[in-house]
């Protein structure tokens, strides 16, 4: 399914870029995804209902998603007609990946034992901007008591682990290899 959602996301991004709506659609798609995630079972039921005619599916989209930009609405019509509305969360994720790549930015999750201040997050962000070469990092702090101390940073698929828990794990492995 990932390839299908990537194709929809890329097509939507291309149209959004032509119309200078990439930011607007990113925000609209995020809002729609939040709504759809809570109703995924119902959305799948709509996708899997062979008795729903195309005009009924389009009417559903018009009623539920009114007010969204034209390119996004057309994509939602296409998803409804192809019984793929349940792919909205995946399309949102793929659209965000494309958006982040084009804008040379990414999400940076910083795990710490306690909530970090904005100043601390900014300093960590600046260090990782230099390290990664990205123009911007979207910072998110998550509290993780199991780290004992230090931080663990995730950017995309890369993890930078500077936690005491990781140091202890590495030390344990070293001792086990000595046996």
Where on the chain are the PLM-derived regions?
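Elongated, mostly alpha-helical coiled-coil "stalk/stator" tethers of large membrane protein machines
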Residues: 1-179
